[in-house]
Each structure stands twice: as C-alpha cells, then as structure tokens.
UniProtKB/Swiss-Prot annotation:
A GO BP annotation: translation
GO molecular function: RNA binding; structural constituent of ribosome
Entry annotated with the keyword Ribosomal protein: yes
Protein's UniProt keywords contain ATP-binding: no
Name of this chain's protein: Small ribosomal subunit protein uS9
Length: 170
C-alpha cells in the first residue's frame, strides 16, 4: 500500500496576497455581454413572437424605421391604427423610434393575434440587440412576457366551451 504522507512538507501560502480579480488586461471599457455596448451603435438582432395561433419571426437591423411585414408596409398589413400602435410600443418605451428597420414574417392566427406576436418578436429582438440597456424597460412594461391565453376547447355535451344547452325542469 502506498504512503499518503508527502516526502517534502508543503510550503506556507500567504492567502492575503491573492485576489479574486484577474490580472489580464481587458480590451475596451464596456462590461456588457451585448454587442451594442461593445460597438456603441445599434446591432442587428432577431426574435420570435407567438400569440394565440400566430407566429412572427422578426429581424431588426439599424436603419430609418421602415417596416416590412410579409413583404408589405406596416400600414398596408395592419390598416387599424390600434394594431400599428401595439406593434410600435417596444420602440416607444425604449425611445428608439426610427433607429431600426423591421423585417417580419407572420403566419397563422388573426389580425389581433398577429399584432401581439409581432410586438413580442420585436421586443425580444430589441432585448437581444442590447440586453443591458433594454431589458429592464421592456420587462417592466411587460413586453417580454408571452401572453399564453388561447381559445378554450369545446367540451362534449355543451354547445360551446362553457355554454350549456337550455335546461328544462319539466
């Protein structure tokens, strides 16, 4: 059996002389994980949003605020001003109007669900573009949370999801 005692005594180590900070020089002054902080300018990013049965794949690139939704402008795709405002809310909260161009592909669902999916996709893309600066405001406004409400299924023996047929006592 091998001996467990070392042949030479261990050297005394002065613990006070060591620090937890690295001695490697850091390039640049930013401490952010995000690319925008590293370069100081808007960066392209992508996000996926879902709402009801709608799915929106969103890509944002630095630009002048142009929207392309399934190859059409925002005003053509969402003629209702309420839906246009809903989709623009993440930019308004971050005060980034006309700083990014948005390219989106939306499929499934209706108009309202598609607008909600697009808003979530835009918010996630903005979050990815600059996590440190954008995440707090987007999270506080509730734009990073998926709205998981969906249509309740119809149950057997009922006319709709909850509506029962008329009850007759006699």
């Amino acid at each position: 059996m091998a001996e467990t005692t070392p042949e030479q005594p261990l050297e005394e180590i002065d613990i006070d002389s060591y620090t937890t900070e690295s001695e490697v020089p850091v390039e640049g002054e930013y401490t952010s994980e995000s690319m925008a902080s590293a370069f100081g300018e808007p960066q392209p990013a992508a996000g996926l949003g879902r709402r009801k049965n709608a799915i929106a794949r969103v890509r944002i690139v630095p630009g002048t605020g142009k929207w392309k939704v399934n190859g059409r402008t925002l005003e053509d795709y969402f003629p209702n001003k309420v839906h246009q405002q809903e989709v623009n809310e993440p930019f308004k909260v971050l005060e980034l109007d006309n700083r990014y161009d948005v390219i989106a592909r939306i499929s499934g669902g209706g108009v309202s669900g598609q607008a909600g999916a697009l808003r979530l996709g835009v918010a996630r893309a903005l979050n990815e573009a600059d996590v440190d600066n954008n995440r707090g405001a987007l999270k506080k406004a509730g734009y990073l949370k998926r709205d998981d409400r969906a249509v309740e299924r119809k149950k057997a023996g009922l006319k709709k999801a909850r509506k029962a047929p008329q009850y007759s006592k006699r």
